[in-house]
Amino acid sequence: MIVGGTTTTSSSRKARKTYFKMVQNVQLTGSVPKIARRESPIIGFLEEDVRRLHHLHGDALVVSVRVRDYNVHRVLVDNGNSADILYYPTFQQMGFDRARLIPTTTLLVGFGGKKVFPLGAVTLSVTVGNYLQQITRDVTFLVVDYSSAYNGILERPTLNSWKAATSTYHLMIKFPTEYGIGELRGDQVAACECYIAMLEIEDHQQTMCIEKQ
């Protein structure tokens, strides 16, 4: 799990305290702030959604999304993560210059127990789903220069903003659109490849830390 990010609850100590009090108030009184609402379709998962999957599995939910004009594969969906991550090599391969990054003082904790300062933040449009059942939203990514088998990570608040439901059993995300329920299927083969690659990266880093006697 990665702690830190661009969400409201982590922007400042005052904002975090304010958010905590709001959550406490809802829990104690059952009242929520009045916001414009419209009826959303019911989202559910079916046994037919697990077709072409090997079971029982313990694979992560790894998807492909469209970021601006690029199809970005090997994107990890992490409900326990509080920061959208774009790894620097991917950022470079998309043709972006480092000057595009917005400076940030955000500190990330969770990469092997280490504290990592992002190179900066960048807001990019992300499209998921298939035409017509798709959505396009702006996502603010923290760009991190760190070894990873993944090209990026989608985090909890972004998934919530899509009103998305995720199922690691079905390796799928579903979300409401103007034209019904959109779907984003995970890639089980890519998930296995990323898992193996991450183990190799970890083994390499541990080897580098061994000192000669």
Sequence positions of predicted segments:
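Short linear "hotspot" motifs
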Residues: 1-213
